[in-house]
Amino acid sequence: MTLLETTVKECLNNVVKQYASQTALIENQSKKTLSWQQLQQEVESVARGFLSMGLTKGDRLGIWSANSKEWIICFLAAAQIGIPVVCINFHLKKRELLDLCRLTGIKALCFSDGFKSNHFIEVINYLSKKASKNKDALPQLFISMGNQQAEKSVSLSQLKETSQKISDKAYQHAIEQVSVKDLLTIQMTSGSTAMPKGVMLSQYNVINNAMLSAQRLGVTHDDVICLAVPLFHCFGLSSCLFFALTTGCQLVLLDNYNAEDVLKAIQHHRCTIMHGVPTIFSRLMKHEQFSHYDLSSLDKGIIAGASFPPALIDDIETILGMKGITISYGQTEASPCCTQTLPNDALEIKRHSIGKPLPFVEMKIINLKTGKPVPVGILGEICTRGFHVMMGYDNAPDKTKEALDEEGWLHTGDIGYIDEQGNYHYAYRIKEIVVRGGENISLCEIEEAIAEYVGVDATKAFGIPSADLGEEVIVAICVQKGYSIGESELREFLQERLARYKIPKELHFFTEFPHTPCGKIDVQALKLQLGYGVSIKDEKNMVAG
């Protein structure tokens, strides 16, 4: 086994050579399909269109849209000619998008009509007016991928019409300038107290990470992935789009996660693979119409992105029938996968570990104070090194130095350990520790204890400042439909399981949690609902994917 030295363009060419007439993409909503050969033709047309509009290698393209074939076409077209893509969260509002454009230096912006109540056209019109006076800081080209046009935008069809202006020689020259080590994408990480950081990933990073993760999962060109996670997120980009690009498998695109839509898509398209954060899987199995759908085609997938109760793996294997489910650990800075269990690993391994490192991935656990490796079974910081580690943070050399040491090790900020079998275990984020009266309290430990109580659907613990003790623990609890939980009874339950100083100061009950587009609990929205705003703790929750 060796690492690939192929660009995105070469990956697409290889897939087309083998599976030209096989379906590459299906849009679940529109039912539109593209074969691999048709996808290649669309990508080439848009790439030529970008060149005709004056974009060149190194210019940055933003994509602001929900999952769609146009999203994929524009991304691959940009990658072919060395234009890095800034993947934009479709929930961003006007001010956030403006800040993001200034932060990343986006020169052109592809956009759709909007997402739910977030209407993009109004924002694009505002942005285009500001852009004329800020040519160095804001996009100068706006490309509509949807049905609506902004005031100063060109449509994707108009862009493709200009592609004939680019000769074959000029197009080939642009392609030949692209290297596997060139910047492919800038992925924005979320932060609770500061501007987000732009993680720079190369074509080499993402292609090889996807290839090795897909191999561990056992993906072939016969597989069909139900793509229910956002493409703007590294999990969706690598484990879905680039799984397809390195194996020739088929993608079924959903523009938004909705449990019933996912159930329908799996049944109709006979999907064999589904990836997601724990919430996606648990919501699916709890849907009132779950038993009405035939999900027998589902075979394997990846669960990542957040901690989960061990029983969830049992349910995924027995209720969903996904015997090949794997657990993956990583973060955006690692392209994103570092470790992954095997599809045929014993349930005990899947319940409690995050598996072994992918091939060519180095891992170690170090003592936080000395920086030296710790023995088997001892907690320390998880560090990783190899082909998958990011190029750095965009325009943030100081932040890059904090994350990457002189020997190339990425310090993940996660605490874990390795067992005697070589499996890694995730414990908690370094910043998911609350110090109450001098005592260190693991928020994960509290969440896991509460999760054992009957009727609890999900939990989120966080720290708040305390004038007396430094910090106190607050817990939000989502109650399962049909259940009622009494606070006094729950406190009695916790007193039998946790030391007195670990008992939360406040327990808050919800019927539903706010979630990010990736399916994770939206911690900042939750804090705002409880009246605490941003806590002194940075809970980025970059556990995986």
Q: Positions of the model-derived regions?
A:
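AMP-binding/adenylate-forming catalytic domain of the ANL superfamily
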Residues: 140, 145, 499-521, 539-544
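Conserved AMP-binding/adenylation subdomain of ANL enzymes
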Residues: 207-224, 232-273, 287
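AMP-binding/adenylate-forming catalytic core of the ANL superfamily
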Residues: 92-99, 111, 274, 386, ...
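Conserved pre-ATP/AMP-binding loop-to-beta segment of ANL
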Residues: 5, 21, 143-147, 154, ...
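Conserved AMP-binding A3 loop
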Residues: 33-37, 184-208
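Gly/Ser/Thr-rich phosphate-binding loop
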Residues: 161, 271-276, 285-349, 362
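Structural core segment of the AMP-binding/adenylate-forming
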Residues: 81-158, 481
